[in-house]
Every structure is written in C-alpha cells, then in structure tokens.
A protein has these predicted regions:
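Primarily single-stranded nucleic-acid-binding OB-fold modules
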Residues: 1-170
Length: 170
C-alpha cells in the first residue's frame, strides 16, 4: 500500500470576536424548543427523539434534560433563525429547568406543554439578540426585550403616512 504524509506550514489564525446583532419580532418558536432530552453518552449530547432515540447511540433511557429555544426573528426585511441555550432560555421565558421538568412530566402533552407555554409567552415579543452567525443561524449570546415608546411609534407611522401621500398608492 502507498504511504502518504502531510506537512502543514505553521500559521497564525485570528479568531473573530465580532458579534452580530439582530432586532425584530419573535415570529416563531420552532419544534424542538423548550424542554428537551439529550444523549448522555460522553461527547455526544445530541437531542433525542420523543422515543429517546439518539441518531448515533440508539435508545437512551438515562437521558439528560436541557432547555433551548430555536426561533425565527423577523426584522421587517429578513427572517433570521436564532438559537438560545439553556441560560438565555430560562431568562427570557421566565421558566427555570425545575419548573420545565415539572410541567413536562405532569402534563398530558408531555414536553410539548413546555413548548406551548414558551410560545404563548414569547411569540410576538420584540427582542435584540447578539451572537455569532453559524451555518445561517445566530447562536445567541445575549438578548434583551425591546420596548417601543408610543410617541416613537406614532412618529414612525406619521412618516410612513407622509411617504405614502408623496409617492401615491403603493
């Protein structure tokens, strides 16, 4: 058999620290959000199916609970996929892990009840998310709710009305 060797030149790599920012309305909380079960196999941690199936390690009955939110934020021009980890999920949903486990294990809907409650609490809310874009999804590192002043909204509506009257029908 042939022998191969690879030589690599030493190189310096700069790791980017720039944070992307998105502001807009949470228009969808996606399936796979809320309270989830993860594969307990060291180094895996994949989300399990409803039947506790890991795509790599098959059935896992000793799963580990976790929380996340996979959502869509729309800024009025473009919709962005965003992902919140456990800490930010607890922060913006107002639901901690113990509460989510209680809800998920006591409801006839199971873990879907946690998703339903998070959707009711969050859909339609305006947020400002900062994080890193990875594979067309913003991995959120910080989030805050955005509140608009009524006078600000009125001024924007007036400007929009003036634009329409100057430009004619849209």
């Amino acid at each position: 058999p042939a022998e191969y060797s690879v030589e690599a030149d030493a190189a310096d790599f700069e790791v980017g620290t720039q944070m992307d920012e998105i502001s807009g309305a949470l228009v969808q909380i996606s399936k796979g959000s809320g309270l989830i079960k993860r594969c307990p196999v060291e180094g895996c941690g994949r989300a399990l199916s409803k039947q506790n199936l890991c795509p790599v390690h098959e059935i896992q009955n000793n799963y580990v609970y976790d929380m996340r939110i996979k959502a869509v934020v729309d800024d009025g021009h473009k919709a962005y996929n965003v992902l919140f980890g456990r800490e930010l999920t607890e922060e913006i949903s107002g639901m901690n892990m113990d509460e989510a486990i209680d809800i998920g294990t006591s409801s006839p809907l199971g873990l879907d009840e946690v998703l339903v409650q998070m959707t009711e609490r969050l859909c339609g809310r305006y947020v400002r998310c900062k994080g890193s874009m990875f594979d067309n999804r913003l991995m959120v590192k910080s989030v805050e709710f955005v509140k608009y002043d009524a006078s600000e909204v009125a001024a924007l509506m007036n400007r929009a009305g003036e634009f329409v009257s100057q430009e004619g029908e849209l």
